[in-house]
């Protein structure tokens, strides 16, 4: 476990929101459904521009005003992602931990960063505080400290690989793209995507994880690799026995 500071003046900080918009065909769209009921999600960056991650990841932190509702969801996601390591088509958890925001912290409005001004309004740079950071193989320590940390004002978080691919929801529903399908999928691709999703869910179920939040916006399509990738396991159950 590491104790580090979250501070946009020097070190790691929270940049643009990732939970208010989706991308497809190199275009961004404000999607209200992308917002989570239990967490906020921001781009996690460092002032130096250098991080130990291959690219800037996503920082998913429990909503400070929904703690009672969010607690069981975070517990499920910690357990599921820690135990599904190595499963293909899965967005991996890179690290996890707890954030204790400074007493004067003001959380940003949930605004899609579709302009520079909106990006400035929606970013999390003013969220500062102390972080207890754990590696994935230390997840048992996270679970053991979970209740006590929350009672002491800490908010659980996950650091996840950021999805950059086309969101499958926008490839299949033209409601937000003004009637345009930004990238047509062939029938073969649609069938392949369906098989990949079923194969992933079957393997997860065999390991003890049940996925219960079946929305297209939880899937991304990697055109280059012809691969579908899933996010968001907090609406799920970990039942290894």
Task: Pin down the residues of each PLM region.
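Juxta-kinase regulatory segment immediately upstream of eukaryotic protein kinase catalytic domains
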Residues: 1-31
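ATP-binding glycine-rich loop module of kinase domains
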Residues: 38-83, 90-91, 97-127
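Conserved structural core of kinase catalytic domains
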Residues: 94-185
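Activation segment signature within eukaryotic-like protein kinase domains
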Residues: 193-194
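Conserved hydrophobic alpha-helix
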Residues: 197-204
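Catalytic-loop of the protein kinase fold
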Residues: 205-222
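Activation segment/activation loop of eukaryotic-type protein kinase catalytic domains
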Residues: 217, 222-241
């Amino acid at each position: 476990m590491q104790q580090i500071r979250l501070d946009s003046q020097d070190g790691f900080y929270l940049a643009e929101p990732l939970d208010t918009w989706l991308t497809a065909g190199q275009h961004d769209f404000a999607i209200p459904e992308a917002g989570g009921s239990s967490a906020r999600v921001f781009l996690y960056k460092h002032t130096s521009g250098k991080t130990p991650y291959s690219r800037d990841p996503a920082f998913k932190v429990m909503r400070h005003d929904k703690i009672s509702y969010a607690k069981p969801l975070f517990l499920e996601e910690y357990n599921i992602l820690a135990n599904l390591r190595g499963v293909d088509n899965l967005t991996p958890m890179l690290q996890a931990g707890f954030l204790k925001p400074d007493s004067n912290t003001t959380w940003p409005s949930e605004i899609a960063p579709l302009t520079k001004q909106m990006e400035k309004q929606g970013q999390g740079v003013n969220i500062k505080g102390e972080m207890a950071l754990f590696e994935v193989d230390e997840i048992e320590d996270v679970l053991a400290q979970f209740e006590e940390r929350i009672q002491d004002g800490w908010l659980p978080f996950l650091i996840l690989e950021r999805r950059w691919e086309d969101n499958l929801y926008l490839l299949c529903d033209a409601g937000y793209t003004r009637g345009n399908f930004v990238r047509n999928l062939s029938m073969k691709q649609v069938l392949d995507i369906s098989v990949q999703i079923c194969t992933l869910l079957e393997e997860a179920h065999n390991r003890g994880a049940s996925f219960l939040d079946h929305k297209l916006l939880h899937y991304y399509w990697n055109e280059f690799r012809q691969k579908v990738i899933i996010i968001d396991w907090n609406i799920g159950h970990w039942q290894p026995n």
